[in-house]
């Protein structure tokens, strides 16, 4: 029996080891595919655009095609049903398929080839013609103008299409209505973009003013081809040759698109929480993008989505980019239409990154875009994305919470719509999702083990015996795990969480648990820093609190010493003493019924809010080596002050009524008192909210700015992480009591991501 059991155990071990090895290899293979995508973006070809390129006549003879290989490609790529649908064809993209199919048979008919394919294509259009006016179908950009124009061209080529008259009349009515709207709103750029749909109405000389340095019109092969057909131009021809040289015998819907594709990949990796696996590749993309930004690259600045994405990505990664380019991108100037919610959403996200007081235009744009998104919530997969962007601004959602929501709502359908549909695995794909789910669940398993250790620490230090103290151990750990989650930051998480518990205990001790003498005893013990100084006159509560402080601070100090190569314990003690002194001052103000001047209150309250012991010791544990000069520098203190002031005021707004009843100091009534009673509660609250906005804006600027900064980025990010924690905790109730928060804690720590 023993031998059989041993054999069974060995077999299980081999199976388990093999399974782990296979999983690791799968993980590595996925990473390798993503790296390849970053270096070499992929983009689908477009039958619609290829058809228009195929219509281009040779510069040497108008009776011969300039690109016969495109014609051959069309002949070889017709679908069995007679259409020229793309592989990513969606049932709601029938208008796109109709448009592409009609363009293809026009190209074949023009050059007198492929009669069989033309007949099959014509039959498909006739059978599916009703879809051209169905409201449930997604309309490609300019469809209502371009499709009727191509039908006119089909008639000129004597292409016999038996179309249902009512649907045809409806199409013509829509075209005329759309053209009228465009002319009335002076949408010249939009009409130039869909120039192939304007026919004889088009002023091609005016269209050519939109020609780019690469010879194209709007980086669109179809627009450029139509322009060359109407008005031969060497730049247009050179552009078409370059597109075919890159893609073979067919062209994409937009080219070049490398900048956008790479940035979209980076955005995917960052939003799903897996960017740390690709730091080298991402840095290369960011540096290249910044170089193109400084050079005024048309690929960035002449496309609203690319410009917005580049601005947001560069600014959030510390690059010095001004907002001028973004504020010039007004919603009604998009080269498309205002139903392009994707571009609107991209611009809205970019406009949230306001760093300077003089960026009023960016503020105004943010408000305008928010109104547009609220009024025109789109249907389909992007609907939930818009809701999340509006309900959870980037400064009010913790990193891991955002990552989980992004994973759960991730749509790996990478189809996008311009004048036709196109797709790219750089926009979205299953590899991104697989890697993010694996990583999230692996990190979460580690977090659960850390939380168990944290709960043991509470018991070992007898903190559970303090009846006056709120039990917030899980929440304190959650705020750490939800902000800096990587496996190598375990020591920083535990320091954050343990000090979070201790500050809660001390805060409750000063509020309700301790007498004046006990408070003074605790401060004296921390000043002396000697366990032997705990005498019989010290209460049990004081003994438990000080012993816990002594052990925990010493433990964190030891870990800090190993990472920093110097002693940091005295600095951590000093941080705690600053907190205790500020709490004592508040206790004295309350005891004396004293209402201090607002400035005095704020200068003490941002310290007494108790974030110092939570955040500042973590600076030593997140990786970079810090000199004494760095941690004592005004930059570090300013970051701490801004973060803590935001937190204190957020708390005061939410707890005003309760703290008034409890006789505690609060910024709202103090502001009213200091104004001589001339300010209402509503006005005082609004002023505090405005102050929070200004402080948060300055905090973000300091965190993101690299030039002239002494603190390393991982250290500065701790202050921003805590700011997001505070905005979530105090967004509704007084933080800890919110049922929403309980749900979020479970999602981050206890419930693995399971995909259907």
Swiss-Prot record:
Q: Which residues bind Mg(2+) 2?
A: 507, 511
Q: What catalytic activity does the UniProt entry give for this protein?
A: ent-copalyl diphosphate = ent-kaur-16-ene + diphosphate
Q: Which Pfam families match?
A: Terpene_synth, Terpene_synth_C
The subcellular localization recorded is: Plastid, Chloroplast membrane
Which residues are recorded as binding Mg(2+) 1?
507, 511
What high-level taxonomic lineage is stated for the organism? Eukaryota, Viridiplantae, Streptophyta, Embryophyta, Tracheophyta
User: Where do transmembrane segments lie in this chain?
Assistant: 606-622
Pathway it acts in? Answer: Plant hormone biosynthesis; gibberellin biosynthesis
Q: Where does Mg(2+) 3 bind?
A: 651, 655, 659
Q: What is this protein identified as?
A: Ent-kaurene synthase, chloroplastic
* Family (UniProt): Belongs to the terpene synthase family.
Its domain comment says: The Asp-Asp-Xaa-Xaa-Asp/Glu (DDXXD/E) motif is important for the catalytic activity, presumably through binding to Mg(2+).
Cited InterPro entries: Isoprenoid_synthase_dom_sf (IPR008949), Terpene_cyclase_plant_C1 (IPR044814), Terpene_synth_N (IPR001906), Terpene_synth_N_sf (IPR036965), Terpene_synthase-like (IPR050148), Terpene_synthase_metal-bd (IPR005630), Terpenoid_cyclase/PrenylTrfase (IPR008930)
Extract one GO cellular component term from the record.
chloroplast membrane
Query: Which topology term describes how it sits in the membrane?
Result: Single-pass membrane protein
Give the EC number.
4.2.3.19
Q: What does this protein do?
A: Involved in the biosynthesis of labdane-type diterpenoid including marrubiin and other labdane-related furanoid diterpenoids with potential applications as anti-diabetics, analgesics or vasorelaxants. Terpene synthase that produces ent-kaurene from ent-copalyl diphosphate (ent-CPP).
Q: Where is this motif: DDXXD motif?
A: 507-511
Recorded GO MF terms = ent-kaurene synthase activity; magnesium ion binding
The cofactor binding remark recorded in the entry reads: Binds 3 Mg(2+) ions per subunit.
Please provide the Gene Ontology terms (biological process) for this protein. Answer: gibberellin biosynthetic process
What cofactor is this protein dependent on?
Answer: Mg(2+)
Establish whether keyword Membrane is in the entry: yes
Give tissue specificity per the record.
Present in both leaves and flowers.
């Amino acid at each position: 029996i023993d031998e059989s059991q041993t054999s069974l155990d060995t077999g299980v071990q081999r199976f388990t080891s093999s399974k782990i090895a296979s999983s690791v290899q799968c993980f590595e293979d996925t990473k390798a595919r993503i790296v390849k995508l970053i270096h070499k973006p992929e983009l689908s070809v477009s039958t619609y655009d290829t058809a228009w390129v195929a219509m281009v006549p040779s510069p040497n003879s108008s009776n011969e095609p300039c690109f016969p290989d495109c014609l051959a490609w069309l002949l070889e790529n017709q679908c069995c049903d007679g259409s020229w649908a793309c592989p990513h064809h969606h049932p709601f993209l029938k208008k796109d398929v109709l448009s592409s199919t009609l363009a293809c048979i026009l190209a074949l008919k023009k050059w007198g080839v492929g009669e069989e394919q033309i007949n099959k294509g014509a039959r498909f259009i006739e059978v599916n013609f009703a879809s051209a006016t169905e409201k449930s179908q997604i309309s490609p950009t300019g469809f209502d103008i371009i499709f009727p124009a191509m039908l006119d061209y089909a008639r000129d080529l004597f292409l016999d299409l038996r179309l249902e008259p009512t649907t045809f009349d409806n199409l013509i009515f829509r075209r005329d209505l759309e053209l009228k709207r465009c002319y009335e709103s002076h949408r010249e750029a939009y009409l130039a973009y869909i120039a192939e749909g304007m026919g004889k109405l088009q002023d091609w000389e005016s269209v050519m003013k939109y020609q780019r340095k690469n010879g194209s019109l709007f980086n669109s092969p179809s627009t450029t081809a139509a322009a060359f057909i109407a008005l031969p131009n060497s730049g247009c021809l050179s552009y078409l040759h370059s597109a075919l040289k890159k893609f073979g015998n067919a062209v994409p819907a937009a080219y070049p698109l490398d900048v956008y594709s790479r940035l979209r990949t980076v955005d995917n990796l960052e939003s799903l929480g897996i960017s740390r696996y690709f730091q080298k590749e991402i840095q290369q993309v960011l540096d290249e993008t910044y170089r193109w930004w400084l050079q005024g690259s048309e690929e960035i600045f002449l496309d609203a989505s690319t410009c917005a994405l580049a601005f947001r990505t560069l600014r959030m990664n510390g690059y010095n980019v001004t907002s001028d380019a973004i504020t010039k991108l007004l919603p009604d100037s998009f080269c498309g239409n205002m139903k392009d919610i994707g571009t609107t959403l991209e611009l809205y996200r970019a406009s949230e990154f306001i760093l300077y007081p003089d960026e009023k235009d960016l503020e105004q744009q943010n408000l305008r875009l928010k109104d547009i998104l609220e009024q025109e919530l789109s249907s389909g997969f992007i609907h939930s994305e818009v809701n999340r962007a509006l309900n959870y601004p980037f400064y009010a959602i913790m990193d891991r919470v955002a990552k989980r929501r992004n994973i759960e709502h991730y749509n790996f359908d990478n189809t996008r719509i311009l004048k036709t549909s196109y797709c790219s695995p750089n926009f979205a794909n299953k590899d991104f999702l697989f890697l993010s789910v694996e990583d999230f669940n692996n990190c979460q398993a580690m977090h659960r083990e850390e939380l168990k250790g944290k709960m043991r620490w509470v018991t070992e230090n007898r903190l559970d015996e303090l009846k006056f103290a709120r039990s917030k151990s899980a929440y304190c750990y959650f705020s750490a795990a939800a902000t800096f989650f990587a496996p190598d930051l375990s020591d920083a998480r535990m320091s954050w969480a343990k000090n979070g518990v201790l500050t809660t205990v001390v805060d409750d001790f000063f509020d309700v648990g301790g007498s004046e003498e006990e408070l003074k005893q605790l401060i004296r013990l921390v000043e002396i820093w000697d366990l032997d100084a705990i005498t019989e006159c010290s209460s049990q509560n004081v003994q438990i609190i000080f012993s816990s402080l002594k052990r925990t601070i010493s433990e964190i100090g030891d870990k800090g010493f190993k990472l920093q190569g110097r002693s940091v314990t005295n600095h951590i003690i000093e941080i705690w003493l600053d907190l205790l002194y500020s709490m004592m001052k508040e206790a004295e103000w309350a005891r004396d019924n004293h209402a201090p001047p607002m400035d005095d209150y704020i200068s003490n309250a941002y310290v007494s809010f108790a974030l110092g012991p939570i955040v500042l010791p973590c600076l030593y544990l997140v990786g970079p080596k810090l000199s004494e000069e760095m941690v004592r520098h005004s930059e570090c203190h300013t970051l701490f002050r801004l973060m803590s002031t935001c937190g204190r005021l957020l708390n005061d707004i939410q707890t005003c009524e309760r703290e008034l009843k409890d006789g505690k100091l609060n910024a709202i009534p103090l502001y009213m008192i200091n104004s001589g009673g001339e300010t209402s509660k509503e006005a005082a609250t609004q002023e505090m909210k405005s102050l929070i906005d200004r402080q948060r804006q300055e905090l973000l600027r300091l965190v993101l700015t690299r030039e002239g900064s002494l603190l390393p980025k991982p250290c500065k990010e701790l202050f921003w992480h805590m700011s997001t924690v505070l905005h979530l905790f105090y967004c509704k109730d007084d933080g800890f009591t919110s049922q929403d928060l309980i749900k979020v804690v479970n999602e981050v720590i206890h419930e693995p991501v399971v995909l259907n």
